[in-house]
A protein has these predicted regions:
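Canonical phosphoinositide-binding patch of PH/PH-like domains
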Residues: 76
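Immediate flanking context of iron-sulfur cluster ligation sites
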Residues: 2-9, 33-57
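Local cysteine-cluster metal-coordination motifs and their immediate loop/turn environment
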Residues: 7-21, 51-68
Length: 127
């Protein structure tokens, strides 16, 4: 595992297609955030999971970002297509692979399928 802290950002305002605006806590993004926090706790993982009000990728809900100091940041979407509990496990799997890299670039063949299909952007490390 990486000694550098990894952060997962989850867009909690993301809505699945046809989903109501209110209540906000029932939106797909909020459900994924809760499922990810729960799955990380159940797995004994000490991960920083941050709820973000909007990541401006509304056409590909739910959007998630993985980042760590000195590493590439990845933005993934399309997690509203699967149950939040399944998406959370996929994200934790991808996160473990991300943490094992020096630069944040998970080799293509090692990425969970949802991280291959769902990649939106890769941003270079800062600094």
């Amino acid at each position: 595992m990486s000694a550098l802290p990894t952060t997962v950002h989850v867009c909690v305002s993301c809505r699945a297609e046809g989903e109501a605006l209110e209540p906000r806590e029932a939106r797909a993004g909020a459900r994924l955030h809760r499922a990810l926090v729960s799955a990380a706790a159940a797995d004994g993982r000490d991960i920083t999971i941050v709820a973000v009000d909007c990541m401006s990728v509304c056409k590909r809900p739910v959007t998630v970002g993985l980042s760590a100091p000195g590493k590439w940041t990845y933005i993934y979407g399309d997690f509203a297509r699967v149950p939040p509990e399944d998406a959370a496990l996929t994200i934790l799997d991808g996160l473990a692979r991300y943490e094992r890299t020096e630069d944040g670039i998970i080799p293509w063949k090692e990425r969970p399928e949802a991280l291959k299909r769902g990649v939106i952007a890769r941003l270079p490390p800062i600094g």
